[in-house]
Structure formats: structure tokens, C-alpha cells
Amino acid sequence: MRTPTERIDELRSWLDGKTHVYIDYANVRAKCEKKDWMLDVYKTWRTFNSLGNVSAIKFYFGKILGNRKSEGFHALLRKIGFEVITKPVKLMKLSIDVSGIPKDSPSIIKTFVEPCLLRKLTVEAIENLNGELRKMNNSGLKYVEMMKCNFDVEIAADMLLDNELHAVDTFCLWTGDSDFAGPILRLLNEKKRVIVFSDGIAPELDDLRPDGLRVYDIKKLKDLIGYEKQKGLSLESPSAKIVGSCDQS
């Protein structure tokens, strides 16, 4: 395992020239949580700011209007030094009311289950799931709320605009979503360096490796910019747990 100093040196070797960082926080947080760790925003900003050649660290995350915790987190991000790009989170009501459908119908379940998995479910499994939903309905629960706030368009637009206006050499993108294949290829074709920070990328991005796309495994930064989710304690400083998770509930 490399020391923090060695990791910093490694980052410097990857992020060459004038660099802009684009953090899709919802995407990063979801991936980190699956590995039982969380991003410490203090240490993230401090780490990349210390490299000397990072001129912008852009943080994309939705805000729940009127929610003190959400609005406070955004204020904190700005105070730390991030360039925060946000918009209101949309709360979508998804029906779980199975009262009007056959017990073996997947019409409600398919809203929450990927098609590839849905096709594998047996009739018995679907009936059991609908049975659980019916119990929820009987207790008065007819819908669930899902928060939605996607920044793919904003991030892609900012990357291309920064390329035109700010002569950026290296683009550090913290998301591995397929929607970025087009913008990334455009930057690569203009001889720019693009590095995706993620522990997994879409096949569309993986196909761009021969064109010059590089992928940095974000798990390697866990000890440098993270803290353990299950303990709620920073790997380096206890104060990090106050700001890292941003549970906007």
C-alpha cells in the first residue's frame, strides 16, 4: 500500500498541466457507499488543491430547497472552496399500489427492477413481491418518493466550454457514465488528456481507452480522501464525518 505522499505524487503524474476537476457527487457517493466508505469533502478539496496545477474543482450536487441540512451542506462546500453547481432536486412519486393488478403482474415491480433482472424472476417471486407491496398498501403506503437530479448535461457542457475558454490541458471527470462518451471523445480528438476517476466505467467509455482515455481507480484514494461508512469515522480525522455523507433526508 502506498503512503499518502506517494499517492499525491501519483496524482501529480496523472494530472499534468492545467487541470479542471468535475465531481458528480451523487454518482461518486453511490459507488463509494457500495464499498462501505464515504468521500470526505474537506480532504478531497485539500488534496487536489495541493497539487498546484488544479485551477478549478467543480462539485455537482442537487439541493433540496427548504431542507436545512441540504442547504447547509452546499454552503459548506462553497466555504471550503469548491465551485458548486446545483439545481433543485425533483421528488418523484412512484406508485406501489397493486390493488388493481393481477397478483402475478410485474407492472408495478418493473418500475424498480432492471429489465435484465425482471426477466429472471419467476411467477412465484413476482407474486411474493406483490404480496409484500400489498401489505404496505394495507398499512396506508401507496407510493414512495425518489429524489432525482442529474447533472450529465451540465458537466459535459462545462467540460467543452472550459476547453474553449480556459485552455485546460487535463480534464478529471468523476463519473463513469456512458453519456460522457461523446464529449470525452471530442476532447481526446483535440489532444486533451481526459482521466475518469471511478471504480467502474460504462462499456462506451472503456472503448475509448485506445483513443487515450485513462481510468484512475478511485478506491486507491480511500485512505487519502475517505472515511469508513460503517464506523462513521474519518480514516484520518474525526471531523470529516460531519460533512462527508450529506444524507439529505
Model-flagged regions — what are they?
Residues 1-128, 144, 188-202:
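Domain-level signal for Mg2+-assisted phosphodiester chemistry and nucleotide/NA-binding surfaces
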Residues 86, 91-249:
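Nuclease catalytic cores that cleave nucleic-acid phosphodiester bonds
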